[in-house]
Amino acid sequence: MNPAPNLVMVGPMGAGKSCIGRRLAERFGLEFVDVDQAIVEQVGSSIPAIFEQHGEARFRQHEAETLQALLEQDNKLISTGGGAVLDPRNRERICARGFVVYLHVSVPAQLTRLARDRNRPLLQRADREQVLHAMAAHRTPLYHQVADLSLETDHLSPAEATAQLVLRLAAQWRMSSNPA
């Protein structure tokens, strides 16, 4: 089984962290928690409302506090927000308390997947493609920094991505529990 207390999903918005994460949690008997959804429940406001009323910095503070509290527990599959890796403390905590899966998605695939999504405050502008490219340039190295395992999701359905991850995670965890 998982050598870390939790399984943590990282990656950009639209990569499939929540959808695939729910499936993996069910498959491995873990409790699924979406950090953004946990923030919404705790604060009582939507993510766009938090950004509008309090700004991104306050949202990132909520994100760090929520992530820390979740990582102090065990047997969770934690789906992080795309920007969670921006905070060095989050990266440190994620690595210390989780086996980290990085779901990668290209900007063209993100644009397709997020075309009708109005719940992404950082994308509520005309230059969505440029914003996504800038985010990818800044965040991709951070995702790689924390990842124990990576999967490209551009051409995979959630079911296909889940099936691949189940096989790869099981193999990885077997190797971790049986050192040579």
From Swiss-Prot:
Pathways involved = Metabolic intermediate biosynthesis; chorismate biosynthesis; chorismate from D-erythrose 4-phosphate and phosphoenolpyruvate: step 5/7
Binding positions for substrate per the UniProt entry: 36, 60, 82, 139
Binding annotation for Mg(2+): 18
**Which residues make up the binding site for ATP?**
14-19, 120
- Segments spanning the bilayer are none
Pfam families registered for this protein in UniProt: SKI
The molecular function terms in GO held by this entry are: ATP binding; magnesium ion binding; shikimate kinase activity
Catalytic reaction list: shikimate + ATP = 3-phosphoshikimate + ADP + H(+)
What cellular component GO annotations does this protein have?
cytosol
UniProt superkingdom: Bacteria
Q: How is the cofactor bound?
A: Binds 1 Mg(2+) ion per subunit.
EC number(s) for this protein?
Answer: 2.7.1.71
Provide this UniProt record's keywords sorted from A to Z.
Answer: Amino-acid biosynthesis, Aromatic amino acid biosynthesis, ATP-binding, Cytoplasm, Kinase, Magnesium, Metal-binding, Nucleotide-binding, Transferase
Q: Which cofactor does it need?
A: Mg(2+)
Does the record's keyword annotation contain Transmembrane?
no
What is the top EC class of this enzyme, as a single word?
transferase
Check the record and name the SUPFAM superfamilies matching this protein: P-loop containing nucleoside triphosphate hydrolases (SSF52540)
* Intracellular or extracellular location(s): Cytoplasm
GO terms for biological process, alphabetical: amino acid biosynthetic process; aromatic amino acid family biosynthetic process; chorismate biosynthetic process
What PANTHER family does the database record attribute to this sequence? SHIKIMATE KINASE, SHIKIMATE KINASE 1, CHLOROPLASTIC
- Purpose: Catalyzes the specific phosphorylation of the 3-hydroxyl group of shikimic acid using ATP as a cosubstrate.
Describe the subunit structure.
Monomer.
Q: What protein family is recorded? A: Belongs to the shikimate kinase family.
- Protein's name in the database: Shikimate kinase
Species name for this entry?
Xanthomonas axonopodis pv. citri (strain 306)
Q: Which gene encodes it?
A: aroK
